[in-house]
UniProtKB/Swiss-Prot annotation:
Protein source organism: Vibrio parahaemolyticus serotype O3:K6 (strain RIMD 2210633)
Keyword 4Fe-4S part of the UniProt annotation: yes
GO molecular function, one term: 4-hydroxy-3-methylbut-2-enyl-diphosphate synthase activity (flavodoxin)
EC number in record: 1.17.7.3
Signal peptide per UniProt: none
One GO term (biological process): isopentenyl diphosphate biosynthetic process, methylerythritol 4-phosphate pathway
Cofactor dependency: [4Fe-4S] cluster
This protein's name: 4-hydroxy-3-methylbut-2-en-1-yl diphosphate synthase (flavodoxin)
UniProt pathway: Isoprenoid biosynthesis; isopentenyl diphosphate biosynthesis via DXP pathway; isopentenyl diphosphate from 1-deoxy-D-xylulose 5-phosphate: step 5/6
Key words of the record: 4Fe-4S, Iron, Iron-sulfur, Isoprene biosynthesis, Metal-binding, Oxidoreductase
Enzyme class: oxidoreductase
UniProt record similarity statement: Belongs to the IspG family.
SUPFAM superfamilies the UniProt entry points to: Dihydropteroate synthetase-like, Nitrite and sulphite reductase 4Fe-4S domain-like
Binding annotation for [4Fe-4S] cluster: 270, 273, 305, 312
Amino acid sequence: MQHESPIIRRKSTRIYVGDVPIGDGAPIAVQSMTNTRTTDVEATVAQIRALEKVGADIVRVSVPTMEAAEAFKLIKQQVSVPLVADIHFDYRIALKVAEYGVDCLRINPGNIGNEERIRSVVDCARDKNIPIRIGVNGGSLEKDLQMKYGEPTPEALVESAMRHVDHLDRLNFDQFKVSVKASDVFLAVDSYRLLAKKIDQPLHLGITEAGGARAGAVKSAVGLGMLLSEGIGDTLRISLAADPVEEIKVGFDILKSLRIRSRGINFIACPSCSRQEFDVIGTVNALEQRLEDIITPMDVSIIGCVVNGPGEAEVSHLGLAGSNKKSAFYEDGKRQKERFDNNDLVNQLEAKIRAKASMMDSENRIEIKVQD
């Protein structure tokens, strides 16, 4: 039940993606990206709504063609979450989606074109009050930087980013955030650390092309965890070769683990052993599925025996400590007279958790310090 994070966040400027504040101490925004064909409007809208349901603050949509831009117009009309248009190669697509109400433009300086094309995009963004994300990726650096450095390095990624930052500065445009993603954890982490020392703009974090659901989640947790623990990062995306909904869940789990931002239940559960008095794994899995709709930040400990059960329960909003036939139940750290039948734990716990959630402030947010 700890509500204060020891992390002091890097001070950054404030921009808005739609109505979502980014930077300057705002809650770290969690976003994902659709993996449907953008021209399949029905499927894309359905996926965006699924992402919004699990807490996505922002959703990015790839817009590779003018046909996709026309589809984007229809998609935007049917969803409420802010949308970022992912633009590569053809700057005219950025101009088109700007007409259709896009909330943010993501462009890659390695392939968007010459300075005049960038100027056209920036002028349009300024006129329509649309922020830009400069998205540098280790796999698509400019050719001259590939020649200069021989391979992606932190210096190469940051030089690419700073070229575009300087260009936007010359155009008197400051409504932007920056990312320097790489698939290698150390390359990404060192790139973000270097960039954080050079600019005050918000930083969008990500380990790009991280891998499948399990390996990608681990890689992202390691890389982003290092950066977030140092106070670096204002938005994030977990890149998984999996259902995008899982990206949002993992993103919130990372923030929750660092006590930066909580959404939903933080289950504290033992891996179980021969001392367990009930099926811990089955109980936790069932509750996670049943209670996905709960957004209230809450710690729930489910421990199968009395070795660690009481101790964990005493620092949780709700807790269960396994005992023979009936297990001990705790609320706000205090043991209750009521005991739970080990053969019906899921139903009993679900009822208690839902009742507790209805009593708590669902808008509660963990306090985070920001550097002066």
